[in-house]
Amino acid sequence: MPFLKPSKVSLKRILQGNPPKPIGLTEYGHLLRLVGLREADSKEENERTILKLNEGIIQMHAIERLDTSFIKEPFRTLNHAINAESLPSLPDQEPWNVFQNAKKRDGQYFAVYSKLKDDSSNESPNKQ
């Protein structure tokens, strides 16, 4: 893969630089070609994107330097297989719609919210 070879604008050098070097317009153009995107029409938009990329790379390097030795299980995954048959189909979505079902049950949050809404609608517009 040519973009991983050590060169001035390689992805590997950009992401693994120690300390990380800021991405410039040349590196940004290289990354855009790498992922198949076009540059933005305005120079300001490109500069904002480059700034965000540089901030993200700096944060990534900071996270890599954190001491995580105290974490016993850093990545938890599902320990059981998912049965695709048990997932809801389109006509069967209603039991899975949490907010709609909570409104139907008229739980405490929704009861208080609806009471506040009713009280505010009873006030006259001239009342201060």
From Swiss-Prot:
A GO CC annotation given for this chain: glutamyl-tRNA(Gln) amidotransferase complex
Compartment annotation: Mitochondrion
Keywords: Mitochondrion
Single Gene Ontology BP annotation: mitochondrial translation
Entry keyword annotation includes Chloroplast: no
Entry keyword ATP-binding: no
InterPro entries documented for this protein: Gta3_dom
Protein name (Swiss-Prot/TrEMBL): Uncharacterized protein C777.11
Source organism of the structure: Schizosaccharomyces pombe (strain 972 / ATCC 24843) (Fission yeast)
